[in-house]
Amino acid sequence: MYIGRFLVLGKTDEGNPFVTYRVSSRSFPNRVAKVMDDNTVAILPKDLEEMFKNPYITYNCVKLVGDVAIATNGSHTDIIADKIKLGLPIRDALSYSLLTMDYEKDDYNTPRIAVVLTKDSAYMGYVSENDVRIKKVELESGKAYYLSVYEACNITKHQVISVAGKTAEEVTKFVMDYEEFEKPVTAATVLLKDGFKLATL
């Protein structure tokens, strides 16, 4: 099944919260997730000239703000992070940013999806052409929600998978290799264990 870009939010078997963002793509497969600094992971084209072909293929997919991790499928990562820096509650930062940015104005009206994760709470959100939703979710060890731009743009217990891996690297590989979801390109994970751990593949 092809679900495009998606987020996986859950806990490892050991109970460590994580979020993984995976790029799955038919149109722009030549991209990489790159750790830019201690607080940022970006999605970049391998050929920088591709940046001029589509405004939606280059963006920060992960931002860390203190004890808060933000992961999304687009430039709204930075907007959410900025609002959290200003002191907005997570729900409000998500709501404001998604409503302000709206869905992507591409040929597919691609939804914007987002996750905000702390040690004690986890939020998921999206804005599509026909809907907007923010939801606080409870995480269970060894399980994870997934939220995608195509086919699975919902926040529901029906969109839960079992996840293997103890480290950020292992979780990233698991999500990249997850065969049910086609066309993997690159992925990035933030895992919370004695602070945030970043990994890309």
From Swiss-Prot:
Pathway assignment: Purine metabolism; IMP biosynthesis via de novo pathway; IMP from 5-formamido-1-(5-phospho-D-ribosyl)imidazole-4-carboxamide: step 1/1
Reaction catalysed by this enzyme: IMP + H2O = 5-formamido-1-(5-phospho-D-ribosyl)imidazole-4-carboxamide
GO biological process, one term: 'de novo' IMP biosynthetic process
GO molecular function: IMP cyclohydrolase activity
Pfam families: IMP_cyclohyd
EC number(s) from the headed UniProt entry: 3.5.4.10
Entry keyword set: Hydrolase, Purine biosynthesis
Keyword match Zinc-finger: no
Role summary: Catalyzes the cyclization of 5-formylamidoimidazole-4-carboxamide ribonucleotide to IMP.
UniProt-recorded name of the protein: IMP cyclohydrolase
Upper lineage: Archaea, Methanobacteriati, Methanobacteriota, Methanomada group, Methanococci
Gene: purO
